[in-house]
């Protein structure tokens, strides 16, 4: 590891509560109930699934990265929304299921006169999202930036 490189650690806890349901949490944060998605036995559409959490983690990490780059460059973000769809499929090489693609559509509004600069920061936001950097899935993001 290079000298001066930061290392971050994140601790979580999981407790099985029966069937195919568990509670996950982290110190000082509310618990989430997690079940399989509707495609699998034991699903409960009222709860998050690991697959939905993975997709949402890419969305939220991309947003936080974009907001950080905008803040560092004096761009005021007025609004930000995104939609994402994750594609889980069997891989050809090892026949295991994995996310192979996540497609996101981001719609953001920035303060007047900064749309061009904000558009230029989108590639940095994608590059610097820690979750994107940690997956082998292709992450495709379509940005709609307006003033």
PLM features: residue spans?
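Extended beta-strand/beta-hairpin segments
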Residues: 1-56, 67-147
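Alpha-helical metal-binding/catalytic segments enriched in His/Glu/Asp
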Residues: 61-62
């Amino acid at each position: 590891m290079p000298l001066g490189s930061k290392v971050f650690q994140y601790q979580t806890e999981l407790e099985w509560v029966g069937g195919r349901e568990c509670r996950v949490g982290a110190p000082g944060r509310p618990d989430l109930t997690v079940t399989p998605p509707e495609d699998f036995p034991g699903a409960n559409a009222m709860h998050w699934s690991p697959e939905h959490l993975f997709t949402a983690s890419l969305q939220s990490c991309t947003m936080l990265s974009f907001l950080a780059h905008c803040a560092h460059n004096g761009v005021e973000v007025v609004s930000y929304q995104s939609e994402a769809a994750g594609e889980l499929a069997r891989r050809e090489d090892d026949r295991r299921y994995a996310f192979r693609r996540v497609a996101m559509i981001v719609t953001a509004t920035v303060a007047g006169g900064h749309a061009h600069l904000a558009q230029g920061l989108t590639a940095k936001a994608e590059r610097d999202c820690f979750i994107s950097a940690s997956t082998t899935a292709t992450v495709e993001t379509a940005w709609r930036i307006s003033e």
